Amino acid sequence: MKLSTLFTLATTISTLTTFTIASPVVVVEKRAINETALAEDIPTTKNNHAQASYGKPFAIYQPKAFIISMFSLERDPWLKAMDFVHNITIPGLSPVYPDIHCTTNYTICQITTGEGEINAASSISALTLNPLFDLTKTYFLVGGIAGGEPNYTTIGGVTFAKYAVQVGLEYQLAYEDYHKTNPDWISGYIPYGTDDQNTYPGNVYGTEVFEVNEKLRDRAVELASKVHLNNGTEGNAKFRKLYNETAAQGLPKVVKCDSLTSDNYFTGNVLNDYFANFTLLMTNGSATYCSTAQEDNATLEVMTRLAKHGLVDYDRIMIMRTISDFSRPPPSMSAYEYFFNRSDGGISASLENLVIAGTPIIHDIVQNWDKIYKSGEKYSSKNYVGDIFATLGGKPDFGKESFDTA
């Protein structure tokens, strides 16, 4: 197809698209990468290596902030708090959550991915690759509820992560299969490519550890620390007192600590102790495990891949988890009794605190867009950001010199 014909077709499609939108499209400044996407010569190759061009020359929406929820309970408080008047359906989203919600001028948008790693990766891929959305300067707030480690937080507490660690990528043996031969093992998990729980994995998939922008995380914490959190119910207060840890007994507050990702919903002292050690192992002692989630590493893997090609800015991602329950029982209960008969009831406070703690950074981004956030310079990362493979450049402050890739 001739380039002139392509431009004519594109103009026609753009015009038709405009007529199908219920409300006026906000005219916004286009990125240089998009302005030149179709003006480039078609590349030639002599080695059979065809490389696709990228950019979204016909993007309509350029949100400043995007809230990522995982399921309806995390989504609903945002829908009540924000003036989301537009519903945008795009291919590839969860069949349960097929719509993206945006404010009147499309400045703030929200997506619900569906729970678990596969749903998160699928939905975020669909969003970031969709031609209607230019996300090159968008800030992302992953906001969900999680289990909490009582050493560092309490029910209703708010956590902002620097690291996300995927703990499910390991070998696993049942207790009956290892306790006689390896009685000193904490659990039946063993890192890939090793036969020792205290040895760094010999081979990796690349999604085991992610690190996000510490300066932006700290800004979000600074703003969230100024608001009054929901402290929960009298029942929450009584349940907190069943724990010995100071953090668990206290009122909810905003803390800097890190997130674990596992599709397996785990609980109890045995697995918590092991995964706490595994977190230290995987991050060379840098991360502090305090929240259990099911999606963060999946979301960050998609963001890493797309950031490599300039479709998102990995420096503009924040991970916030509020605590709906403890990840281990109080001393007076067994793990079984706690998990199946618990009465901590912290989910209400955790859901309200998603909005209470997340709104300040969202508003700060929108209100100070031209002065601070558009360029991203003030809160650009000084720490390493990215995955264990250094996909985005730099040198990870975790991992080891080389791996076998699985």
Curated annotation (Swiss-Prot):
<feature type="signal peptide">
    <location>
        <begin position="1"/>
        <end position="22"/>
    </location>
</feature>
<dbReference type="Pfam" id="PF06516">
    <property type="entry name" value="NUP"/>
</dbReference>
<dbReference type="InterPro" id="IPR035994">
    <property type="entry name" value="Nucleoside_phosphorylase_sf"/>
</dbReference>
<dbReference type="InterPro" id="IPR009486">
    <property type="entry name" value="Pur_nuclsid_perm"/>
</dbReference>
<comment type="similarity">
    <text>Belongs to the NUP family.</text>
</comment>
<dbReference type="GO" id="GO:0055085">
    <property type="term" value="P:transmembrane transport"/>
</dbReference>
<dbReference type="GO" id="GO:0005783">
    <property type="term" value="C:endoplasmic reticulum"/>
</dbReference>
<protein>
    <recommendedName>
        <fullName>Purine nucleoside permease</fullName>
    </recommendedName>
</protein>
<keyword id="KW-0732">Signal</keyword>
<dbReference type="GO" id="GO:0003824">
    <property type="term" value="F:catalytic activity"/>
</dbReference>
<comment type="function">
    <text>Nucleoside permease that transports adenosine and guanosine. Does not show any transport activities towards cytidine, adenine, guanine, uridine, and uracil.</text>
</comment>
<keyword id="KW-0813">Transport</keyword>
<dbReference type="GO" id="GO:0009116">
    <property type="term" value="P:nucleoside metabolic process"/>
</dbReference>
